[in-house]
Amino acid sequence: MGSRRNKAILEWLFVGIVMVLLSLPLWLKVDQLPIRLWDEAQNAVNALEMSQTHNWLVRTYDYQPDTFDCKPPLLIWFQVLSIKALGLTELAIRLPSVIFSILSCFVLFGLVYTMTDKKWIGLIAVLITVTSAGFYGEHAGRYGDHEALLILLILGFLYCLYRYSKSPLNKYLYYMGAVIVLGVLCKSIAILMILPGSVLYLWYSKSLPGLFSNKHLYYATLMVLVLVASYYLGRTYYQPDYLYAVWHGELLPRFTNTSKMHHFRYISFWFYFEVLYKETFVLWSILVPFTILIPVMKRKFTKKWFFWFVNGMTLLLILSAGTKHHWYIAPMIPLFAGLVAISIYDLFERSKILSFVLLFPILIIGFSRYSKAYGDALHPTEKWDEWERYGISHFLKDDRHLSNLSSNTKILLRPYNAHEAYRFYLKRIEQQKGLKINRTTFAELQIGDTILSHHKMVYDSLQQDYRVEVLDSSYQYTKLTVLHSKDAVTNNGPNNE
C-alpha cells in the first residue's frame, strides 16, 4: 500500500515538473516587447483609465466610452487588479493572460486525464498546445488580449459538459451557465459558438433527451439571461448608444461583414484551415489526418473522440463562415490537441505497439516545436517590418530616453497606414511625470518643434523642409528631433544605441 502511494506521489511530482517546463514559453521574458497593436493596446488604455476613474461598467478610451471595442470588461477588471499590484507595466497588462493560459493547460490536462486515466496522454495534449504558435504567440497566451481568458472559459465549459455527460448532475448545468456568463463578459458571444458542437456531442452520447426534460436547464438558462442582461442594461444606462455599438461591433453585422462600424476585407472560407496548417499548428497538423484514420481502423467513433472532433470542427466551421483575424482561431489549438491526444489513446487501447511507434514522431515534433517556442520566448524581438510600428513604443518604454522629452514634444506619423500602439506609454508618462505629448501633422509643424517619429518617410520629409537636429535616436528610424530653419546651423549629433 505504501509503495503504491509513493509511486503515485512520484508520478504526480513528475507531472508537475513537466507542466512547469511546458509553461516556460508562456511566461519567459513576457514583458520585454512593448504593448502590441490592436486589442492589447486598446485593453491597456482601457485598464489604465479604469484604474484611475474606477468606472467598472464602461470601458473608456481617452476617458470617453469606447465604441471601437465594446466588449464587456471582465478581462479589464483583472488587468486593473494587476496594475494595482504591479504598477503601469507590460507585466501588469499581460500577467492575467499568462495565468489564464497556464490554468488552461491544467484544465486541458485534467479533462484528458478524466477521459483516459492516463497522465501521459494528458501531457501530450498540453505539449501540443503550448508548442503551437497559435496558443503562445501574439494575441494569445502571452499577451493582454481576450483570447487567453476565452480559451480558459471554453475549456472549463467543455470540462463541465463532459462531466455532465458521464454523470448528469444538476450542478454541472449551473457551472456551465456560470462559465457562459463569464465568457460573455469576456468576449461577448464568442463563447456561444461552442454550443452547437456541445449539443451534437450530447446527442451522440444520448444525453440530450434527459437534458431538455430537466427543469434545471431552464433555471440555468434564466440565470444566464438575467446576469448578462443586467450588465448590458446597466452599461446602456451610462452609455446610451452601447447596444447599437454592440450590434454592429460584436453581433451579426460584424460576423457577416455588414457592420456600419467595422469593415473587413474578404478572406476565403478556407483561410483558417491554411493558417492552422502553415502558421499556428504547423507540424502538429501532420497528425490531424491520423485522427480521422484511427477511428476508421477501429470501425468505431468513441464518445471521447467524438467529443473533441465535433467541438473542434464545429467551432472551426462557424468561425470560417464569418469575418476573420489570425487570432480568432486560438481556441482551436487545445481542441485539436485534445483530439490528437485522444486518438493516440484510442490507438493505444487497440495496439500498444502501434501507439508507441506513433509516440516516437510525436516526441520528435514536440522537441522541435518546444525548442522553437522556448527560443521565441527567450529572445523576443520585432520582425524587420515592425520597427516602424513599435519604434516609438520602444523609445517611450526605455527610461533612458525620457529625459529628452519636453512639453514641446509632438509625435508625427506618416499620413497613411499609421497606428498608435504607443498610447499606453503616453498615458503612463502623463500620469507619472505630468508630461502630455500630443500627435501633430505636417501642416501644423513650426520652427522649434520637437518631433518624435519612427517612420523613415517622415524623417526624409522633414529633412527636405527643415534643418533637423537629432536629440536622441533609437531603433532604426525612431528619432527625437528639433526643427530649425534651413538657414540655421545646428550641431547634428545623434545618440545612437
Feature map (PLM): residue ranges:
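Transmembrane-helix signature of polytopic, membrane-embedded enzymes
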Residues: 12-17, 108-131
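Extracytosolic helix-loop segments that constitute the early lumenal/periplasmic catalytic or substrate-binding loops
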Residues: 24-29, 43-67, 74-77, 81, ...
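Transmembrane-lumen/periplasm boundary regions of multi-pass, lipid-linked membrane glycan transferases
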Residues: 43-50, 182, 191-300, 312-322
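Transmembrane-helix motifs of polytopic, lipid-linked glycan transferases
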Residues: 95-116, 156
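Membrane-interface transmembrane helices that cradle and orient dolichyl/undecaprenyl
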Residues: 114-116, 155-173, 297, 344-347
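Short hydrophobic alpha-helices at membrane interfaces in multi-pass membrane enzymes
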Residues: 120, 160-181, 309-312
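Hydrophobic/aromatic-rich transmembrane helices and adjacent perimembrane loops
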Residues: 323-349
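Short periplasmic/luminal acceptor-recognition loop of GT-C membrane glycosyltransferases, typified by
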Residues: 368, 372-488, 493
